[in-house]
A protein has these predicted regions:
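Residues forming the flavin
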Residues: 1-327
Length: 327
């Protein structure tokens, strides 16, 4: 299934310029921004949320506000449990970053730039999708808390590589009694990092089908040259859960029917690619939680998946707050 989603490509370097322009605009209009500052907790009173507590050296600095908006990572999950913020366990996506030659994806890249494809491979029929496609892009490493290394991808507006990369993600929706989806995905990532000595692991698709690891010498002789130069050749299947790995393999076979050559032996799979969406916070159409004055945004709220939709949610929140102020 192809999801129709028209986009305009901004590029990593252009995005940085845009974010800086936004930051400068806020600063010029009197908005105080604090970086490298830890928010310890929220301030709750009988009437609702009244502010936040920031770490200020060895003490806590209270910052009061009529409206508090949270757009964080798994810290919000802890807040939900501590303060009884209405929520339900969210989805986590576990998968790989796939890299192939540009000519394999040439027709798709020219027509769509980023194709969003969804499938439900047998036997489990879990939702598997493509995400964050980067024609002429580069595979990159991100580092999360506790030195968790995960793979990602990006592309520049001007500088291009000979490869296209994209994520293939398997959605995991857990049921009772399990309620720690983020911790589950983190463990998968930690195990992969252990096998790769702290580095991202990469394996050729053909080697996976042959039941063998990829060696550095083989990778160096491959037609597809990895754009993440310090990725370690190895066996990603030793850490990837069987169900997720099977879904990924079957989905690649399905994609090969649409994009011939995608399932080539030389296609590279990097691991781990993890997307943490936190628990889904219950909110109404005004983005109000069950606690008065408290709102949640972006992927941490469990309502969006990706930068674009998280940004749109931020614009919506701004408009709602402006309406309350009569602006």
């Amino acid at each position: 299934k192809l999801v129709d989603c028209p986009i305009r490509h901004l590029g990593t370097e252009k995005a940085q310029e845009l974010y800086l322009a936004i930051q400068n605009y806020l600063a010029d209009n009197g908005v105080e921004m604090r970086f490298n500052t830890e928010c310890e907790n929220i301030i709750l009173e009988e009437e609702g949320c009244k502010g936040v507590l920031l770490k200020d050296g060895d003490s806590l600095l209270p910052v009061y506000a009529d409206e508090v908006v949270i757009g964080t990572a798994d810290w919000l999950e802890k807040l939900c449990a501590e303060h009884h913020i209405a929520h339900k366990p969210g989805t986590v996506d576990i998968g790989v970053r796939v890299e192939c030659r540009n000519e394999v994806m040439e027709k798709v890249n020219k027509v769509l730039y980023e194709s969003k494809l969804i499938g439900y491979p047998k036997p489990w029929k879990n939702k598997v999708r493509t995400f964050c496609q980067n024609p002429g892009g580069f595979v990159a490493q991100e580092n999360y808390d506790n030195d968790l290394a995960v793979v990602n991808g990006h592309s520049f507006k001007e500088k291009k590589s000979e490869n296209t990369n994209l994520a293939i993600l398997v959605s995991h929706n857990f049921t009772e009694p399990f309620n720690q989806p983020i911790a589950y995905a983190q463990k998968v990532g930690e195990l992969t990092n252990m096998l790769g000595a702290g580095h991202i692991m990469v394996q050729r698709y053909g080697d996976i089908l042959d039941g063998k690891r990829t060696w550095a010498k083989e990778l160096a002789q491959s037609n597809v040259k990895p754009t993440l130069k310090d990725a370690v050749a190895g066996d990603i299947t030793a850490a990837m859960p069987y169900r997720a790995m099977t879904n990924i393999i079957e989905f690649i076979k399905m994609l090969d029917m649409v994009v011939p050559g995608f399932a080539a032996n030389e296609t590279l799979l990097y691991s781990p690619e993890l997307k943490f969406y936190s628990n889904k916070v219950k909110m109404d159409s005004n983005l109000d939680t069950n606690i008065k004055g408290l709102h949640c945004l972006g992927d941490s709220s469990g309502w969006t998946r990706g930068l674009m939709m998280a940004s749109v949610m931020g614009v919506l929140m701004g408009r709602k707050l402006a309406e309350k102020e009569g602006c």
